[in-house]
From Swiss-Prot:
PANTHER family according to UniProt: EXODEOXYRIBONUCLEASE 7 LARGE SUBUNIT
Lineage: Bacteria, Bacillati, Bacillota, Bacilli, Bacillales
Oligomeric form and interacting partners: Heterooligomer composed of large and small subunits.
Recorded family membership: Belongs to the XseA family.
Keywords for the protein's UniProt record, in alphabetical order: Cytoplasm, Exonuclease, Hydrolase, Nuclease
Organism of derivation: Staphylococcus aureus (strain JH9)
GO-annotated biological processes: DNA catabolic process
Main localisation: cytoplasm
Any GO CC annotation of this UniProt entry: cytoplasm
Name of the protein this chain belongs to: Exodeoxyribonuclease 7 large subunit
Gene: xseA
GO MF terms held by the record: exodeoxyribonuclease VII activity; nucleic acid binding
EC top class named in words: hydrolase
Catalytic activity: Exonucleolytic cleavage in either 5'- to 3'- or 3'- to 5'-direction to yield nucleoside 5'-phosphates
Length: 445
């Protein structure tokens, strides 16, 4: 019986063999998480599987606290672990020291972390977005020199707004060198003084589009002074460049639509503006014509002297009052001098008095010149107004051989208002003439 081993002894021996094998102390394993559970103690229990096999695994709380993501059922992971035996059950399992997402999962993890960082910095804030010019003169297009994206953008801009100059900047959009090339081309386009920049490429996997998730590329777009339209991938594709750009387009074609106005819509707007302006001008001219006709019927325009008689009288009155004021001032000064002569020695003050007289004389001359200048200005102004009013006077019009035609006390301005045998009164410069219409001839007859 001494040759038989107990279950515990065999299990301990197998565990000892596992623990002494250096190849099992640090193994790298790739697989999918299943039956994932997080214990209240903080330890993680799960299986790692592929298409053919399953291994039990656990991760102690200390190692689990160092993870930079939350593991979940179905995650594809890369593990660093040691292999040992769980004695109580007698099965082998792995004890995981490190865990990270594999492939695309890792990319999404990096993407979310960078998105959170840039969001906190304000790189995606709407307040920092620049408006896209409505009527661009120059548009820089950053994309691959071949492919559907550049063709779609080029044809759409040409059909919508051919006045815009397109500056095509061939750019690497995929591969190891694409990141630096995209940054360089964005900075170059920003230095050209264009109105809008379109950064775009066709669709692809997250790996294909990853250059537009690179932090340096996103910051180059955010720091660009020229408005940028991002058109990376298809409608369902999103990159961090879309969030940093001033506006995101679902496709390269939509980017061209956003960047340009439609020439046919503009033509319709111009035609509408032209119609509205023409209607306004016609209405304004008609209002002014009626206003002139209304003014011409005023009594004062028939007797223009009524407009300036009172002004002439007022000017004469002001002239008279000014002269009286000057004379009164002069008399006051003369009387003052006489009093001074009586109080002081005339000889001692003669020099001062002469100077005062010269000052008064100079002042008087200046006042007289000023008065004459003002009077002349008023006369010229009134003369111009009289001439303008006389030019508008019906009397002066009649002096040039014209006559005012009246029928039953109404002024006739058109042959359409006359018929044969109408009795008319013609007002001429020196009297009235009664007349009778024998025949009416219109200019278009």
């Amino acid at each position: 019986m001494s040759d038989y081993l107990s279950v515990s002894a065999l299990t301990k021996y197998i565990k000892y063999k596992f623990d002494q094998d250096p190849h099992l102390q640090s193994v790298l394993i790739k697989g999918e998480l299943s039956n994932f559970k997080k214990h209240s103690s903080g330890h993680l229990y799960f299986n790692v599987k592929d298409k053919e096999s399953v291994i039990s695994a656990m991760m102690f709380k200390g190692s689990a606290s160092k993870l930079n993501f939350e593991p979940k059922e179905g995650d594809e992971v890369l593990l660093e672990a040691r292999v040992s035996v769980f004695e109580r059950r007698g099965n082998y399992q792995i004890y995981v020291n490190k865990m990270q997402l594999d492939g695309i999962g890792n990319l999404y993890q990096k993407l979310e972390a960078l998105k959170k960082k840039l969001t906190e910095e304000g790189c995606f804030d709407k307040a920092n977005k620049k408006s896209i010019p409505k009527f661009p003169k120059k548009i820089a297009v950053l994309t691959a020199s071949t492919g559907a994206a550049i063709r779609d953008i080029h044809s759409t801009i040409n059909s919508r707004f051919p006045l815009a100059e397109q500056i095509q900047i061939s750019t690497l959009v995929q591969g190891e060198k694409a990141k630096d090339d995209i940054i360089e081309k964005i900075e170059y386009a920003d230095s050209l003084g264009v109105d809008t920049i379109i950064v775009g490429r066709g669709g692809g996997s997250i790996e294909d589009l990853w250059n537009f998730n690179e932090e340096a590329v996103v910051r180059a777009i955010y720091n660009c002074k020229t408005p940028i339209i991002s058109a990376v991938g298809h409608e369902t594709d999103f990159t961090l460049s879309d969030f940093a750009a001033d506006i995101r387009a679902a496709t390269p074609t939509q980017a061209a639509v956003i960047a340009t106005p439609d020439q046919y819509e503009l033509l319709q707007q111009i035609q509408q503006y032209q119609f509205t302006l023409t209607r306004f001008i016609k209405k304004h001219l008609e209002q002014q014509r009626k206003h002139v006709e209304h003014l011409s019927s005023y009594y004062k325009f028939k007797k223009p002297t009524l407009l300036y008689d009172q002004q002439i009288q007022r000017r004469d009155d002001l002239e008279k009052r000014l002269k009286q004021q000057i004379q009164a001032t002069f008399e006051q000064q003369r009387h003052r001098l006489m009093l001074l002569q009586q109080r002081y020695n005339l000889k001692a003050l003669l020099s001062s008095v002469n100077q005062e007289q010269q000052n008064n004389l100079q002042l008087t001359n200046q006042l007289v010149k000023l008065l004459n200048s003002k009077i002349l200005s008023y006369k010229n102004d009134l003369k111009n107004k009289v001439e303008n009013l006389n030019n508008l006077s019906p009397t002066n019009t009649m002096l040039r051989g014209y006559a005012i035609v009246n029928k039953k006390d109404e002024v006739i301005t058109s042959t359409k208002d006359l018929t044969e045998n109408d009795q008319l009164t013609l007002t001429m410069k020196d009297g009235l003439v009664d007349a009778k219409v024998t025949k009416v001839r219109c200019n278009n007859d």
